[in-house]
């Protein structure tokens, strides 16, 4: 790309006289200010559009993930409320699940790729607690 192609480059004439040929320093300053603001507004607008597009693409996955975590915690909490007093393993697992499935721990950069896809580590974590849920459900509610 040559300097002539760069619309942000100003020629010496534009610097001296402004785009519209005005020689006033105040007018030149005003033109420069508006040109810079227009450039920044364009950059900001492009960033917002890309951010919104990324949000729109990944929101369903994040929503599903949040629902999945909430469902595991809720069901383990119910089992703990009903049977935790007599089952120390269940109570211990429930407390550990609460700690490991905190949203601030689940939604860390380490659990997602550059494309914001869930990593194997996150999938393994969820599979572990879903497995525990199946174990305790079949132990206490065998017909489910």
Curated annotation (Swiss-Prot):
**Could you tell me the gene encoding this protein?**
YAE1
Q: Where in the cell is it found?
A: Cytoplasm; Nucleus
Q: What does this protein do?
A: The complex LTO1:YAE1 may function as a target specific adapter that probably recruits apo-RPLI1 to the cytosolic iron-sulfur protein assembly (CIA) complex machinery. May be required for biogenesis of the large ribosomal subunit and initiation of translation.
Region span, deca-GX3 motif: 38-78
Q: Which superkingdom is the protein from?
A: Eukaryota
Report any one BP term from Gene Ontology. Answer: protein maturation
- Asked whether the keyword Cytoplasm is assigned, the reply is yes
**Family label:** Belongs to the YAE1 family.
- GO cellular component terms attached to this protein's record: cytosolic [4Fe-4S] assembly targeting complex; nucleus; Yae1-Lto1 complex
What are the top taxonomic ranks of the organism? Eukaryota, Fungi, Dikarya, Ascomycota, Saccharomycotina
Q: Which GO terms describe its molecular function?
A: protein-macromolecule adaptor activity
Q: How does it assemble?
A: May form a complex with LTO1.
- Provide this UniProt record's keywords sorted from A to Z: Cytoplasm, Nucleus
Q: Name it.
A: Protein YAE1
């Amino acid at each position: 790309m040559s300097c002539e192609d760069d619309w942000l480059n100003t020629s010496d004439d534009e610097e001296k006289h402004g785009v519209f040929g005005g020689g006033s320093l105040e007018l030149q300053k005003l033109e420069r200010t508006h040109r810079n603001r227009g450039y920044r507004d364009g950059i900001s607008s492009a960033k917002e559009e890309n951010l919104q597009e990324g949000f729109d693409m990944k929101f369903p996955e994040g929503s599903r993930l949040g629902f999945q975590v909430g469902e595991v915690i809720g069901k383990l909490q119910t089992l703990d409320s009903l049977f935790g007093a007599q089952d120390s393993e269940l109570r211990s697992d429930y407390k550990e699940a609460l700690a490991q499935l905190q949203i601030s721990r689940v939604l860390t950069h380490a659990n997602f790729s550059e494309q914001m896809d869930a990593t194997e580590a996150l999938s393994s974590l969820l599979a572990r607690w879903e497995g525990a849920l199946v174990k305790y459900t079949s132990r206490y509610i065998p017909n489910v």
